[in-house]
């Protein structure tokens, strides 16, 4: 998942979901440390590998495909807060309503992209680790990855639950975005 999951918390109105986001954030920290542990055991100088990740155009492009919608939501949320549009909401201001709806559209797209990340992209990247484990190679790393996959499956269930609740009308303003097709969520 995304380590910045906590940035969605101010836009969460359910204490149960906020607690869930806190646990999710903790899991992501553990995942990050687990990946670091694996890298330190595979490479004699893992710093070289870590440094090249941020310079590899293919990796950066793949990451931006997933995180683009998320970044747009976070940036818009900050702008919404700083512009004080939220203070106008109670007055029924036309502009504040448009801003709020646009923010919710971006939140929907961000959650849909995280859903795709958790449900598809991570499992594709785990395939090699699982194969090594089946061949009795790097079994410790394969076990770590299987625990991470278990957590990612929980994150998938969370995002699917959020999307399904929106689709069912949990938030009338958000339900209108649930007709978007998966490929449209990356805009």
Model features per residue range: what roles?
Residues 1-6, 179-185:
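Short, small-residue-biased leader/transition segments that mark boundaries at the very start
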Residues 149, 153:
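C-terminal, active-site-flanking charged/polar segments
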Residues 21, 111-115, 145:
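Short alpha-helical scaffolding segments that buttress acidic/His motifs in well-ordered protein cores
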Residues 8-19, 41-49, 101-104, 127-147, ...:
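Inter-helical turn/loop segments and adjacent helix faces that build the functional surface
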Residues 50-132:
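Eukaryotic endomembrane system proteins
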Residues 7-87:
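Long, hydrophobic, well-ordered secondary-structure blocks that form the structural core
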Residues 4-10, 26-33, 107-132, 154-158:
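Alpha-helical bundle segments that constitute or directly flank the non-heme di-iron/ferroxidase center
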């Amino acid at each position: 998942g995304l380590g910045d999951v906590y940035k969605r918390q101010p836009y969460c109105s359910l204490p149960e979901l906020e607690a869930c986001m806190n646990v999710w954030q903790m899991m992501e920290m553990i995942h990050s440390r687990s990946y670091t542990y694996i890298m330190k055991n595979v490479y004699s100088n893992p710093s070289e590998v870590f440094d090249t990740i941020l310079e590899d155009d293919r990796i950066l492009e793949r990451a931006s495909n997933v995180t683009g919608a998320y970044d747009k939501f976070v940036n818009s949320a900050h702008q919404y807060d700083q512009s004080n549009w939220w203070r106008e909401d109670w007055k029924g201001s036309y502009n504040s309503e448009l801003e709020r709806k646009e923010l919710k559209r971006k939140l929907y797209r961000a959650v849909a992209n995280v859903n795709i990340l958790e449900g598809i992209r991570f499992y594709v990247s785990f395939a090699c680790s699982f194969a090594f484990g089946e061949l009795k190679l790097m079994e410790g790393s394969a076990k770590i990855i299987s625990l991470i996959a278990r957590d990612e499956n929980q994150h998938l269930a969370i995002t699917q639950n959020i999307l399904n609740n929106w689709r069912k009308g949990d938030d009338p303003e958000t339900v209108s975005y649930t007709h978007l097709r998966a490929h449209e969520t990356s805009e």
